[in-house]
């Protein structure tokens, strides 16, 4: 737990390659042949500036190294909403991310199947919203993979 939180909030990236290998192995095992491209849940420009990095993008890129492919940027976070980690109620978490993302290029999304990468899943609100946006932009399918799951799940 401490290592993941240090990675997410303090940019402690010494375990990044191991995380990428672990996620690549799990994705191949669980989702083999179910996706055409790999993408990630982005952070807002404001959070990127504050934190200095996008942890889900880094996880996605690390996973893609193992497969000799490039991640595809599909989503843009258009609203710097309060951090999900500070919200406990699942309904409030869903409302907090509603409308926070938009497709970067719907034409590049249409008809493709995506593996969507995020760092930690708690209630699934963020992933659900990102899947909704990708499918509304024409994605044929979206499967999700996270590095960790919150204890309550």
What feature does the model see in each segment?
Residues 70-153:
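PRPP/pyrophosphate-binding module of the type I phosphoribosyltransferase fold
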Residues 1-65, 90:
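Extended interfacial segments that mediate partner engagement and assembly in macromolecular machines
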């Amino acid at each position: 737990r401490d290592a993941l939180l240090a990675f997410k909030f303090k940019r402690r990236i010494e375990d990044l390659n191991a995380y990428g290998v672990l996620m690549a192995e799990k994705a191949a095992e669980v989702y083999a042949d179910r996706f055409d491209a790999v993408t990630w849940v982005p952070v807002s420009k404001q959070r990127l500036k504050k934190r200095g990095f996008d942890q889900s993008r880094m996880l996605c890129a690390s996973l893609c190294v193992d497969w000799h492919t490039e991640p595809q940027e599909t989503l843009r976070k258009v609203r710097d909403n309060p951090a999900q980690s500070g919200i406990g109620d699942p309904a409030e978490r869903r409302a907090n991310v509603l409308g926070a993302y938009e497709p970067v290029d719907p034409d590049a999304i249409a008809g493709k199947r995506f593996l969507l990468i995020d760092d930690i899943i708690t209630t699934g609100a963020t992933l659900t919203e990102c899947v909704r946006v990708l499918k509304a932009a024409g994605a044929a399918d979206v499967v999700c993979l996270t590095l960790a799951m919150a204890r309550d799940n």
